[in-house]
């Protein structure tokens, strides 16, 4: 795992914990790489303690040449000709009365293929909101219809960071629609719901992490560059979703263990699901140490505008994920510790809450990280 992927994946887990704390029994889906990339773009224009807080929270201090590494990563995961579609769409929207430095605008365009759009928050914030939503809609093939709800921006807004991700991948081995049936899914020890359960028998990377008491299954996408990795607890052992212990103990090392799976015959039962989650990340990032960025008196974004009176009003991220028989649409290693298995086909029945991530295998980056409590 390279410096940047370690930094990004560690940040992904820390952000995942804060998102789950604020919504302990709900679904979660976000794109950590997309958020890291967007914040790196802000970091490029940050100075002083604002830059130091971003660097520490994003673990940039452990990696060199951050911006050129992000440039390479973006090119790698979004390259044309791949059998999947992945678009990281980041854009800053700034109040038009501010002067933004031409060299900063040129840098974010060159390094992050991003730009800064000037809008009239001061006199026409509702028009600005609609313009932002229209742009996001276009970037995500209309999957994300309304990133900014009414009231998210107003006449006091100075600068917002918009972050949208669109991904579409097809399974290497598709589920057959005729095998999909109604089946129970346990939301907790006492509550169940009926879901559309897909079925597939195939030879797939599988393992077991004893510390977490969970099975791990890797489902490759066409081309092999991306995989969905599912972490399924043996059972619901707590009084909520059954995920409490896994979430507490999920570390960078445990993520790396998920790279050491063994191919075996598996009977997979996986629910079809569709999720859409939106986050204003200010408070979550504040919990992780990014505070000055959102303060009108403390923020130092003088590398963006040349002045000290600019700060970020909102950082908004929205992800959409749909898993079906064909594949996924989203918007948004320690040898020996994963135990392989047996000669009979392994049953992998996803009939209770689980975690998943979508990994870019060549770089080991976690592109999406999610929790499904109710498919």
UniProtKB/Swiss-Prot annotation:
Coiled coil: none
Glycoprotein recorded as keyword: no
PROSITE patterns attached to this UniProt entry: SERPIN (PS00284)
Signal peptide annotation: none
Disulphides: none
GO molecular function: peptidase inhibitor activity
SMART domains: SERPIN (SM00093)
Site (Reactive bond): 343-344
Record-level GO BP terms: negative regulation of interleukin-1 beta production
GO cellular component, one term: extracellular space
Subcellular location field: Cytoplasm
Tissue: Expressed in heart.
Protein keywords: Cytoplasm, Protease inhibitor, Serine protease inhibitor
Record's keyword annotation contains Ribonucleoprotein: no
Family: Belongs to the serpin family. Ov-serpin subfamily.
Function field: Regulates the activity of the neutrophil proteases. Forms only a stable complex with CTSG/Cathepsin G. During inflammation, limits the activity of inflammatory caspases CASP1 and CASP4 by suppressing their caspase-recruitment domain (CARD) oligomerization and enzymatic activation.
Subunit annotation: Monomer. Interacts (via C-terminus) with CASP1 and CASP4 (via CARD domain); these interactions regulate the activity of inflammatory caspases.
Protein name: Leukocyte elastase inhibitor C
Species of the source: Mus musculus (Mouse)
Gene: Serpinb1c
């Amino acid at each position: 795992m390279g410096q940047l992927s370690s930094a990004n994946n560690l940040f992904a887990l820390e952000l995942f914990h804060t998102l789950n704390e604020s919504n302990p029994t709900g679904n979660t889906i976000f794109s950590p790489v997309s958020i890291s990339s967007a914040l790196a773009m802000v970091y490029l224009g940050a100075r002083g303690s604002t830059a130091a807080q971003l660097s520490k929270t994003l673990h940039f201090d452990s990696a060199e040449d951050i911006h050129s590494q992000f440039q390479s990563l973006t090119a790698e995961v979004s390259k044309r000709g791949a059998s999947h579609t992945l678009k990281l769409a980041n854009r800053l929207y700034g109040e038009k009365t501010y002067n933004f430095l031409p060299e900063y605008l040129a840098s974010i365009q060159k390094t992050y293929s991003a730009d800064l759009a000037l809008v009239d928050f001061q006199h026409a914030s509702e028009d600005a909101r609609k313009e932002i939503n229209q742009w996001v809609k276009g970037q995500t093939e209309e999957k994300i219809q309304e990133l900014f709800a009414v009231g998210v921006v107003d006449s006091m807004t100075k600068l917002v960071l918009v972050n949208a991700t669109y991904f579409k991948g097809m399974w290497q081995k598709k589920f057959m629609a005729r095998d999909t049936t109604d089946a129970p899914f346990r939301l907790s020890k006492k509550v169940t719901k009926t879901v559309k359960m897909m079925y597939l028998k195939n030879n797939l990377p599988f393992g077991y992490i004893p510390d977490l008491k969970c099975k791990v299954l890797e489902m490759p996408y066409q081309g092999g560059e991306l995989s969905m990795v599912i972490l399924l607890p043996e059972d619901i052992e707590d009084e909520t979703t059954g995920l409490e212990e896994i979430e507490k103990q999920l570390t960078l090392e445990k993520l790396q263990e998920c790279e050491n799976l063994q191919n075996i015959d598996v009977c997979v039962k996986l629910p079809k699901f569709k999720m859409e989650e939106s986050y204003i990340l200010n408070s979550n990032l504040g919990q992780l140490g990014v505070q000055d960025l959102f303060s009108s008196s403390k923020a130092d974004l003088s590398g963006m505008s040349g002045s000290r009176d600019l700060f970020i009003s909102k950082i908004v991220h929205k992800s959409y994920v749909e898993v079906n028989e064909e594949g996924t649409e989203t918007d948004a290693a320690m040898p020996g510790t994963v135990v392989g298995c047996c000669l009979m086909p392994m049953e992998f029945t996803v009939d209770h809450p689980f975690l998943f991530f979508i990994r870019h295998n060549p770089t080991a980056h976690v592109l999406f990280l999610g929790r499904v409590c109710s498919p």
